[in-house]
Amino acid sequence: MTLKELVKSCRPDVDCYVTLIKKSKSDPRYYDWRPLRPYGDTRTTADHILNWWYDDLLGLEVKSIDVQGGLHGQLGIDVVRWID
């Protein structure tokens, strides 16, 4: 499932915390991650991701999903990009 497919199935106002995981096929030990929050964003909702994020991010494969509670709920999404 891609990030776009997942986010399209969410409520538009759900908070999404997206983490990019970079992996190397040639070196299975290589593993790096960082939060994906484009410059200037203070909040990342499903609606915002669909409307403003570039296709190269939306097409990334979802690795894991973590749903957290709270008043509105938050979706933690790990996506993977292979670097080689």
Where are these regions (language model features)?
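Short, structural beta-strand-to-alpha-helix junction motif
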Residues: 1-4
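Acidic, low-complexity, intrinsically disordered interaction modules
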Residues: 20-79
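Short loop-to-beta-strand transition segments
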Residues: 15-19
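Short acidic DE-rich linear segments
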Residues: 82-84
